[in-house]
Amino acid sequence: MGPSAPLLLLFFLSWTGPLQGQQHHLVEYMERRLAALEERLAQCQDQSSRLAAELRDFKNKMLPLLEVAEKERETLRTEADSISGRVDRLEREVDYLETQNPALPCVELDEKVTGGPGAKGKGRRNEKYDMVTDCSYTVAQVRSMKILKRFGGSAGLWTKDPLGPAEKIYVLDGTQNDTAFVFPRLRDFTLAMAARKASRIRVPFPWVGTGQLVYGGFLYYARRPPGGPGGGGELENTLQLIKFHLANRTVVDSSVFPAESLIPPYGLTADTYIDLAADEEGLWAVYATRDDDRHLCLAKLDPQTLDTEQQWDTPCPRENAEAAFVICGTLYVVYNTRPASRARIQCSFDASGTLAPERAALSYFPRRYGAHASLRYNPRERQLYAWDDGYQIVYKLEMKKKEEEV
């Protein structure tokens, strides 16, 4: 061993001494941490056991209550089924009584008409209408309905253009508004956030009531000019028809409707003064005047010029009427009660005189108790588009052939 060996030994001993002290402190620290973790674990186990015991007690208390609730639910379900069966039975009995004792339909064939040409712009009055198509159908019954959704307020109009794209939907909410919603297809209209999918078209003058019509790419509607019905002034008794081009968004024509002292044609729909309709024959208008405040009037319009071609005084009463539509030149008036009950077609008027009285049967709408703010017939689909207290409904119609009058 050389002279440097003792020095190396002393250096090694001096270096390992502090290392052993650090290891000792580290072991003590780990032991303290493990003891703390064991204590916290024991506390968690005690708390878990206590919560499990409380949960068992709560479950034992709830089980009898759940059994009682289940028994009550079954009892309520049984009572509901019983009430539903009784309601169905009552409706069948009412339907039977309605078929056994139907209200007499109001039908007029207009045989005694001798009226000549009317004043300029008013058209011929009470002359039989000459059909321009071979349409010869009448309503047999309102077969079924489908509730699409609820959109807008209690009164409004939704429809399709019978001469336009088959999928496009037009929605006009309210009785005094100037903005129409246009949906590219029915599926977009049924979405929860439907308004985001719609384009908006604003007309220059607000419409009146729910008598608007989309036909051949145009929006036809009645406008109240300053001083129109309800507004006072010189034009107190007049309304102006507007023809609005939906694509160009411009007014292409307008005309003062040639009837004085206008009043709402439907006793249950006070905001509508002129109800426009379209069928296989073209454009029609339903209205009423103070000259005969008990019955409806019908007019055939020229969709190009808005001229009135013919007018008729119908036997259909205004009282309890809520809406109407035209099919193959025949006016069908829908009646209801207040408060609302089951709507029914109780009066029809064939302008051409080909509908035999016995063929104009009373027809009830499917089982829904509501009030129709508007009805629009689509001749391409043979369906009615209805607005019922904010609900948009489609009615399918069953047709039958008209019988020629002998």
UniProtKB/Swiss-Prot annotation:
Signal peptide: 1-21
Superkingdom, natural source: Eukaryota
Domain Olfactomedin-like: 134-401
Residues bearing glycans: 177, 248
InterPro entries: Olfac-like_dom, Olfactomedin-like_domain
Parts forming coiled coils: 25-101
Keywords: Coiled coil, Developmental protein, Disulfide bond, Glycoprotein, Secreted, Signal
Localization, UniProt: Secreted
Function: Secreted scaffold protein that plays an essential role in dorsoventral patterning during early development. Stabilizes axial formation by restricting chordin (CHRD) activity on the dorsal side. Acts by facilitating the association between the tolloid proteases and their substrate chordin (CHRD), leading to enhance chordin (CHRD) degradation. May have matrix-related function involved in placental and embryonic development, or play a similar role in other physiological processes.
Entry protein name: Olfactomedin-like protein 3
Species this protein is from: Mus musculus (Mouse)
